[in-house]
């Protein structure tokens, strides 16, 4: 079976309908029965439009980079990608083939 991993690069402050984008993406993926999703919080990062930002022990309201990742079959990923693109706007989305060796229902 062919599997795909999608990574969506966003920031902590990004919103979807006034709610945190990363949580809304995970909720949408869960409702669409995607095998699994994860949000990774960076300790530092930059983009073409913003300088390097990094975390410190005193930062409470920082705007650090986040990566939302999910993995499932090509068919299931293709089904949710239009909504992911709508929610992510112009943010970077990467799709890559993966070989799932172990874990949940993806391995037969």
Residue ranges and their predicted role:
Residues 1-108:
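Positively charged, small/polar-rich N-terminal and surface patches that mediate targeting and assembly
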